[in-house]
UniProtKB/Swiss-Prot annotation:
It comes from the Bacteria. Keywords: Cell inner membrane, Cell membrane, Membrane, NAD, Quinone, Translocase, Transport, Ubiquinone. It comes from Burkholderia vietnamiensis (strain G4 / LMG 22486). GO terms for cellular component: plasma membrane. Belongs to the complex I 30 kDa subunit family. NDH-1 shuttles electrons from NADH, via FMN and iron-sulfur (Fe-S) centers, to quinones in the respiratory chain. The immediate electron acceptor for the enzyme in this species is believed to be ubiquinone. Couples the redox reaction to proton translocation (for every two electrons transferred, four hydrogen ions are translocated across the cytoplasmic membrane), and thus conserves the redox energy in a proton gradient. It is an enzyme of class 7 (translocase). This is NADH-quinone oxidoreductase subunit C. Its main location: membrane. The keyword Ion transport does not apply. Its EC number is 7.1.1.-. PANTHER family: NADH DEHYDROGENASE [UBIQUINONE] IRON-SULFUR PROTEIN 3, MITOCHONDRIAL (PTHR10884:SF14), NADH DEHYDROGENASE UBIQUINONE IRON-SULFUR PROTEIN 3 (PTHR10884). It is a peripheral membrane protein. The gene is nuoC. Signal peptide: none annotated.
């Protein structure tokens, strides 16, 4: 008798055929990689096929592969990864799609297939700059309105570009370039035998 993973793998290969770029198993879960051009069609098949029935998208995130692994990675830079759940069959599936263009990463939106992807896609847009084509309200979710850049990209500086502070003269919050002053930290060495009442 085939295991659940083997049954799911066979059902995916039968339903999707040549649209499967890769299908791998890791840590007891399958990862399905598809092309951006097939992404929407595959998502609808995963949801509607009676042998698959992935009714829920439970998570979606962006990934920046710029410095992936040992630095020898040569594939596309950005991907969107969805975690799917079939309540009917008690299956989970990781669906990954790579954006074909690294300079302007665009992938189709899954909002019409799974409405739960709405805010997840907004978060991935905000933090990674992934543009979800067809999204009804693609705007920033976590960063400030005037924020420049996408903070989870690997080429974004850790300190950021600007900092905000309250200006008492203008009586409002203002932005200014980041000011990080280098400082030397000298460890404090205590040489007293009974410092702070401690007994040795």
């Amino acid at each position: 008798m085939a295991s659940k993973i083997e049954t799911l793998k066979a059902n995916l290969e039968a339903a999707l055929g040549a649209r499967v770029v890769s299908l791998t198993e890791a840590i007891g879960e399958l990862t399905l990689v598809v092309k951006a051009s097939d992404y929407l069609e595959v998502a609808k098949t995963l949801r509607d096929d009676p042998k698959l029935r992935f009714e829920q998208l439970i998570d979606l995130c962006g990934i920046d592969y710029q410095t992936y692994g040992d630095g020898a990675y040569d594939g596309p830079r950005f991907a969107a990864v969805s975690q799917l759940l079939s309540v009917t069959n008690n299956w989970r599936l990781r669906l990954r799609v790579f954006a074909p263009d690294d300079d302007l990463p665009i992938v189709p939106s899954l909002v019409d297939t799974w409405s739960s992807s709405n805010w997840y896609e907004r978060e991935a847009f905000d933090l990674y700059g992934l543009v979800f084509e067809g999204h009804p309200d693609l705007r920033r979710l976590l960063t400030d309105y005037g924020f420049i850049g996408h903070p989870f990209r690997k080429d974004f500086p850790v300190s950021g570009y600007v900092e905000m502070r309250y200006d008492p003269e203008e009586k409002r919050v203002v932005y200014q370039p980041v000011t990080i002053e280098p400082r030397e930290i000298t460890p404090r060495v205590i040489r007293e035998d009974r410092y702070g009442g401690l007994k040795h």
